[in-house]
Amino acid sequence: MARKALIEKWKKTPKYATKAYTRCRICGRPHAVLKKYGICRICFRELAYKGEIPGCKKASW
């Protein structure tokens, strides 16, 4: 329940620009968000594994 409230709070325009912070667009996670994609590392990993992120593939060496 708290997460839903925080996601709704995040969607609103902040009173001051410095109060804005990044959240994952898919799951709402506030930590480890990749700014370029706007999603967290966990969602990024899942989407990259499925091949849904263009130009990205899992590294293996």
Curated annotation (Swiss-Prot):
Binds 1 zinc ion per subunit. The keyword Zinc applies. Keywords: Metal-binding, Ribonucleoprotein, Ribosomal protein, RNA-binding, rRNA-binding, Zinc. InterPro entries: Ribosomal_uS14, Ribosomal_uS14_bact, Ribosomal_uS14_sf. Zn(2+) binds at C24, C27, C40, C43. Its cofactor is Zn(2+). GO terms for biological process: translation. The keyword RNA-binding applies. GO terms for cellular component: cytoplasm; small ribosomal subunit. One of its GO terms (molecular function) is zinc ion binding. Binds 16S rRNA, required for the assembly of 30S particles and may also be responsible for determining the conformation of the 16S rRNA at the A site. Part of the 30S ribosomal subunit. Contacts proteins S3 and S10. Belongs to the universal ribosomal protein uS14 family. Zinc-binding uS14 subfamily. This is Small ribosomal subunit protein uS14. It comes from Clostridium kluyveri (strain ATCC 8527 / DSM 555 / NBRC 12016 / NCIMB 10680 / K1). The lineage of its organism: Bacteria, Bacillati, Bacillota, Clostridia, Eubacteriales.
